[in-house]
Each structure stands twice: as structure tokens, then as C-alpha cells.
Amino acid sequence: MNNLKKNDKEVLEEFANLFPILLNEIKKELEKIDFPKESIHWIETVIKANSTGGKMNRGISVLESLESLNEGRALTRHEIFQAQTLGWCVEIFQACYLVSDDIMDQSLKRRGKPCWYKQKRPNSDQEVGLAAINDSFIIESCVFILLEKYFKNESYYLNIVELFHKTGFQTQLGQLLDLTTQPIRGDFSSINLKNHTRITEYKTAYYSFFFPVALAMLMSKINHEQAFTTAKDILLPMGVYFQVQDDFLDCYGSPEVFGKIGRDIEENKCSWMICQAILNGTPDQINLLKKHYGFDNPTDVEIVKKIYKEINLEKIFKDYENTSYNFLIDKIKTTCIYLPPSVFLKILSKIYKRDK
């Protein structure tokens, strides 16, 4: 039994130490089918490069949520291992979408390093390039190798496999919305908070917030529909709040701290920042934004950021952050009938006023 309460650093280290073991299991499965060594090395490199280096909040949330859901008793070593393994499945699952998202957005950096498609191929000076598309498929498939190996005999196996498929589909729908609601330059008719919220819920909130907690609930054999509804009602707004932070940091965050170079302005994104600028700007400012938003050159970007400063979007964001935090705290206190509030408070404490 695990009776000693670990601090955050110890939890992170223990979680990180499991990754090489799981990666080796994937390698062994590939060796069983006599796959070429060079190709196995490629797959190992792909998974390691894209699954590690982040904050690992989503993965660790599975274990932390399981602990909160089972307050009053210590988890067994087996339960801890299973939760950590599921957590890594979440992190690896996320990696496949980061790889494809960076290609579609033509991003340059991810977690402080060049995006995978911009990196050198294993044992080559050539860029990975569009081979990264297939790599994203492979990363996703490797998740199901791990799920089958470690959870096939669990009573909740089918439920977690279905949840992975459903979450993947929701994320893909979110990416579709993100790509197809990008307006024609100068046309702001589709840039509004309603569209922003819809994109965010599907692209970010489900897999980053609801997904890890729902996995812990399935491990705990919670099957009350209202419990899952409550979790969704709290975690989707939390995911929207998280994305708004991301949109703010995309513009104002330090690339060294944030881990990537923001490109929402250049890519004509339906970002919270431009939505607020349209709501709070003067007609002249909005006309200027229509002329300069969505163009990939420094002069246009600088003009957009200058207008953001004139509108004082930093203050608008800080007010939003405080309002959202209070809203979420109140929602947790008033709706947590079937689930302990600590499940959600722990997650909220990690993202409140974050800078990366």
C-alpha cells in the first residue's frame, strides 16, 4: 500500500520514470512482428520526442483524480501503476494531435524545441517533413497497444477504449472547427465568443480536462450518469478558461517560458483576443484590425498588437481570469453532489494564473 503522501516533485518523478518502461513494451511488440530495427528506432524517437518535455498535467491528473475519488483509503500499488499507465496513454495520445496540429498551423516551436515535422529525421540531416503525418497515426496506434497489454483483463477495459475513441473524435471535430471557421481576411463575421467556445470545448476541453478525470472515474467503477454530467459541466468551462489563457499567452507570453512562438494573429485564428478586441474596440480600431489581422508579416502583427494595447486587453484578460476563477469555485461548491470537490480544485489550482 502507498501510505506516504508524496509531494508534487516526487509524483512527477515517479510518473516520468514509468515512460521508458512503457516505451520498451511498445518496442517489444514491434519486435514480435519482426519489424526492421531502423523503423523501430524511428517509432521510439517519434514517441519520445513528442510525448515528453511537457508539464504532464493531463497524465498526472488521472492518478490525482483517482486518489481524490477514493478519499479515505490508500490506493494499492497496482491501482497506482494502472493510473500512471493510463496517464501516459493520455500524454502519448495527446502527442499525435500535437504533431498534426503543428503541421496544419505551420508552427515552428513546440515545448521550446522545433516542431516534430521541422526536426531532423533519425540518423539523417533531412527534415521529417510530411512524414510526420504518418507518425501521428503511429503514435495514436501505439496507445492501443498499451491499453490492450495492461487493461485487457480489467472490467472497465471496453469503457476506456471507447472513451479514447470518443475523445479522439471530439478533438478531430474541434480541429475541423478551428480550421474551417477561420474567416476570409477582413471578414470578422465568424469571429465571436460563441464560435471560440465551441472550438475550444471540442479541441481542448474534452481531452485536456474531462478525459483524464473520466478515466479515473471509470477506474473507480463510477457509472452514475449524473456524475459524468457533473464532471463535464465543471471541466468544459475550465477547459475554456485554460484556452483563453493560452490565447493570451500566445500574444503576450514569453516564448522561452510558454514553450512556443505564438502565431494566432498571423494565422487569422478565432482567438479570444481578437474576439475581445472586436467587442471593445472603436469602429476605427476594428477597421484597422480588418486590414491587418491574419497577415504573416511583422508589420501587420505589430499594428494588431498595438491596437490590443490601446484597448487594454491585458486588463480585460485579468478581469476575465478572476471572474472565471470565482465562477468555477462556485460551480464546484454547488454542483459536486456525486463527486468530491478536491477532484476539480486540484486541477484548477494548477492552471490559475499560469504563465506557461
Swiss-Prot record:
One of its GO terms (biological process) is geranyl diphosphate biosynthetic process. CDD domains: Trans_IPPS_HT. It comes from the Eukaryota. SUPFAM superfamilies: Terpenoid synthases. It comes from Dictyostelium discoideum (Social amoeba). Pfam families: polyprenyl_synt (PF00348). Binds 2 Mg(2+) ions per subunit. Key enzyme in isoprenoid biosynthesis which catalyzes the formation of farnesyl diphosphate (FPP), a sterol precursor. Its EC number is 2.5.1.10, 2.5.1.1. Its main location: cytoplasm. Pathway: Isoprenoid biosynthesis; farnesyl diphosphate biosynthesis; farnesyl diphosphate from geranyl diphosphate and isopentenyl diphosphate: step 1/1; Isoprenoid biosynthesis; geranyl diphosphate biosynthesis; geranyl diphosphate from dimethylallyl diphosphate and isopentenyl diphosphate: step 1/1. It is an enzyme of class 2 (transferase). It catalyses: isopentenyl diphosphate + dimethylallyl diphosphate = (2E)-geranyl diphosphate + diphosphate; isopentenyl diphosphate + (2E)-geranyl diphosphate = (2E,6E)-farnesyl diphosphate + diphosphate. This is Probable farnesyl diphosphate synthase DDB_G0278823. Dimethylallyl diphosphate binds at R110, K203, T204, Q243, K260, K269. Inhibited by aminobisphosphonate drugs (aBP), such as risedronate and alendronate. GO terms for molecular function: (2E,6E)-farnesyl diphosphate synthase activity; dimethylallyltranstransferase activity; metal ion binding. Its cofactor is Mg(2+). One of its GO terms (cellular component) is cytoplasm.
